[in-house]
């Protein structure tokens, strides 16, 4: 295709594989019987210029030697110099050889400058989606409970998170965390220690997260695979596939990874408890839910208990508080569908977009792709 740029691999694809499927370190799938140098040579001869995350030169040097024996030194040198040329061209284009030094004063004017930070913060605000804004406990003169008036007494419960796994399957202990460790800015109101003292509860949650693999299940004769749950309470997969689509890892003696009939629970299940407990304790006072959405989530477990729901996708707390307290009238729309329930998740087609039965809340709003609200009501439908 006459591509003249750099081909860089994903991270960790040439090293020897982990001994068990539980590990998620090196991933040399399909070439696990080769040496690391042989894997590198295979990649190089197929057009790879750079190995992501690899700082060891030894296997590359060994790959060159093997290549010289196999293809001849002239051919291997030409191939290595081609990658060197591609890599160096980008550096030349940046002028880093001609002028490798930075002017600290000039850098200070550019990096983190007011203009760039303003644009970044505005992008955060624009991405926030107001899913629900009930009029039931709205102040006089407002169509919904949001924006909150400033100067209120606000209760914000701590989050309790159970034991979990990090990205590389490292064990993480249970923890308790304050969702606003720097405190509630005084311009918004006063944070209080109990729902009884508060005018409003502000509950920060994250979408349900779980561990989809169990060594205990494997030891007990299962295949180790558990359902990925998008709800907080225990989920039993009654409508999952009997036979999985994928399977056949060289470290497993089976190909069916089905989790049909198995149960899993979100390790942040206590997020749901916080909402329900606040609803009971607050009585007729409003409960506002602010959800960090890392993946689609089942809303029916708590939606009816919340007066307002604000969804964000990894922005600063300051941007969220702007929406809650009237500093920014939300404009964001859902970039995903929120499923009606876990059956809808299991029944959707993995390779088809926007085919899921979506959740309709207690106000009659459909949490479909493109849905969102502002303080006045539901945003107008997108023009196709």
Model-derived regions, located:
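C-terminal non-catalytic regions of proteins with extracellular/luminal or membrane-system context
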Residues: 2, 8-18, 33, 59-74, ...
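Short acidic/histidine-rich active-site segments
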Residues: 3-20, 24, 38, 42, ...
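Active-site mouth loops of central-metabolism enzymes
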Residues: 23-34
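Long, well-ordered, tryptophan-enriched scaffold segments
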Residues: 47, 54, 58-98
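An alpha-helix initiation/capping motif
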Residues: 81, 85, 114-121
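Flexible hinge/switch segments at interdomain interfaces of large molecular machines
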Residues: 95-105, 203-206
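Histidine-centered catalytic/metal-binding microenvironments
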Residues: 103-116
